[in-house]
Amino acid sequence: MTSADYASRQRAIIAELNVAPHFDAEAEIARRIDFLAQYLRSTGLRTYVLGISGGVDSSTAGRLAQLSVERLRADGYDARFIAMRLPNGVQNDEEDAQRALAFVRADEVLTVDVKPAADAMLRSLVASGHAFETPAQQDFVHGNIKARERMIAQYAVAGARRGIVIGTDHAAESLMGFFTKFGDGGADILPLAGLSKRRVRGVARALGGEELIVMKVPTADLEELRPLRPDEHAYGVTYDEIDDFLEGKPVADRVYETVLRFYDGSRHKRALPYTMFDWPAA
């Protein structure tokens, strides 16, 4: 591809992911709290539910959610935010998760250990006769099972509490497809949509998040053979490079190539299930 081709695709992706050319943290906070409050009221439902991992994304989305329900209550609408801790046994960075909960200040906190359910599913797969190709493949699949068990737990609570599940997907993760389909990618509302990773950090900082939360190294921490593996190691590019792409800045050819490969390869994650009316794509 030529430089002009790269730039053309970059502009199209930025528009598709709704990344604004300019950023004002305080304005984004106000806009996103308004969005959350208005949406919940419009549904007639009463509760937001979100899993809090300890990272900046869930911390930021959680604080926005809490502020939105407080606004609704001040206006006479009975609303509540439930933060869920969803460890897989003992979480490696539990201290960070507790710090995040203190920042979010949710109305209610529920803790559900997903390890028994995730391990039981893996055992059932093995007992069925299914054979994994390598221990690494088994570990990867097991990691995605954990992510999906977490979403099952959140939807169970939301279903019982007239609730809506919040997702933490933002433009950088959406661009790279770095989420589990029907796991952490399964949600009803995405208050961080359109933000690059550095802009999520900017919102978190403006909300009063301490630097240990704001600058925590992003990790899905789903694989037991590679605990706390940074997202950037999986990408092969840094978040700064991803964010530069999203914010319309020039990046090296290798960054264009890597970003576009991830974006094209994860297109199915950003779409509803295909039907015969969708394929072949126009």
Curated annotation (Swiss-Prot):
Mg(2+) binds at residues 57, 173. Keywords: ATP-binding, Ligase, Magnesium, Metal-binding, NAD, Nucleotide-binding. It catalyses: deamido-NAD(+) + NH4(+) + ATP = AMP + diphosphate + NAD(+) + H(+). GO terms for biological process: NAD biosynthetic process. The keyword Zinc-finger does not apply. InterPro entries: NAD/GMP_synthase, NAD_synthase, NH(3)-dep_NAD(+)_synth, Rossmann-like_a/b/a_fold. The keyword ATP-binding applies. Deamido-NAD(+) binds at residues 148, 181, 188, 268-269. ATP binds at residues 51-58, 168, 197, 219. Pathway: Cofactor biosynthesis; NAD(+) biosynthesis; NAD(+) from deamido-NAD(+) (ammonia route): step 1/1. GO terms for molecular function: ATP binding; glutaminase activity; metal ion binding; NAD+ synthase (glutamine-hydrolyzing) activity; NAD+ synthase activity. Its EC number is 6.3.1.5. It is an enzyme of class 6 (ligase). GO terms for cellular component: cytoplasm. Belongs to the NAD synthetase family. Homodimer. This is NH(3)-dependent NAD(+) synthetase.
